[in-house]
């Protein structure tokens, strides 16, 4: 079957795009690997009317609603290669199936490169976090930490200090300059130079951070700014232009989420440096409606 649109990725951006194309009565094939970025988090915050909801439950509900449209079909799998051009795209899946369509929406998301610190990975998305607007309120006025991972970490520490007492762990990163230290001090941010050895606490909670010099520092949340990578190389295969941001690559899009390749749209975390469920949904709506209109006009 030659679909009107192929969507690679069935998380918040992809499902939003599928919804609007389906409501435009277009045939849509959604290809999803089933590994959304925020699957590690127990709660999602800041999204209209869904504050505190479990992200996987949100996606399950959204998928069921999209599946109610007769023109949408879902395939569990991974897109491994692509070819063609506008009106004649072909995507090969890891099952060797070839899916064909007139338009292509990329919404396959990103993955995070976490520091190799014992106790960190299992707390990612819960007490090890990256976005204060998504998770910060729940840790208000508690013991907060920021791990120095990039030049942006100083800015992150300045911001996080708005939510509570903050310690900047220089760890093994580059030491900030005198001006940055002065600004951190002005904001009341404590500086800790000893490298981090491990995180400790019950379950997904943090109670303290262990340093290489043997000290245990009380802590309730650790903010990190991990590098990330695109979950698929499909955009490179088609020659979509990229932007190199401090924490990873993103696919270039215009205001309608159109890439530099005719007929290919992109949405969600793969197109922006700032990430949230709300932005991903908005991107998906924009890409879905733009793809639909390109089929009409």
List each language-model region with its residue ranges.
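Beta1-alpha1 glycine-rich phosphate/pyrophosphate-binding loop at the start
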Residues: 3-57, 143, 148-174
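N-terminal glycine-rich dinucleotide-binding loop that anchors FAD/FMN and/or NAD(P) in oxidoreductases
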Residues: 27, 33-35, 42-69, 130-131, ...
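Short, well-ordered coil/turn residues at beta-beta hairpins
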Residues: 9, 101, 107-109, 114-116, ...
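A Rossmann-like FAD-binding core segment of flavoenzymes
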Residues: 66-86, 91-93, 98-99, 164-249, ...
């Amino acid at each position: 079957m030659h679909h009107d649109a192929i969507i690679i990725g069935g998380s918040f951006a992809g499902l939003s795009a599928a919804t609007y194309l389906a409501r435009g009565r277009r045939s849509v094939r959604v290809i999803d690997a089933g590994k959304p970025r925020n699957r590690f988090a127990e709660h999602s915050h800041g999204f209209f009317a869904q504050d505190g909801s479990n992200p996987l439950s949100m996606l399950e509900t959204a998928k069921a609603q999209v599946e109610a449209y007769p023109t949408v079909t879902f395939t569990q799998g991974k897109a491994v290669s692509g070819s063609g051009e506008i009106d004649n795209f072909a995507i090969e899946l890891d099952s060797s199936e070839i899916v064909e369509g007139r338009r292509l929406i990329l919404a396959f998301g990103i993955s995070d490169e976490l520091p190799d610190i014992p106790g960190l990975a299992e707390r990612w998305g819960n007490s090890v976090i990256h976005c204060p607007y998504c998770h910060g309120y729940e840790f208000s006025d508690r013991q907060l930490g920021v791990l120095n991972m990039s030049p942006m970490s100083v800015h992150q520490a300045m911001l996080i200090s708005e939510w509570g007492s903050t310690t900047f762990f220089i760890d093994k990163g580059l030491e900030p300059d005198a001006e940055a230290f002065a600004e951190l001090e002005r904001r009341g941010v404590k500086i800790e130079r000893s490298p981090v050895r491990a995180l400790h606490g019950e379950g997904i909670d943090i109670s303290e951070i262990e340093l290489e010099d043997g000290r245990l520092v009380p802590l309730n949340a650790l903010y990190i700014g991990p590098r990330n990578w695109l979950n698929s190389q499909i955009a490179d295969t088609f020659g979509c232009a990229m932007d190199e941001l401090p924490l990873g690559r993103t696919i270039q899009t215009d205001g309608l989420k159109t890439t530099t390749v005719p007929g290919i749209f992109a949405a969600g975390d793969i197109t922006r440096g700032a990430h949230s469920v709300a932005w991903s949904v908005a991107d998906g709506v924009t890409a879905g409606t733009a793809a639909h209109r390109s089929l009409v006009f």
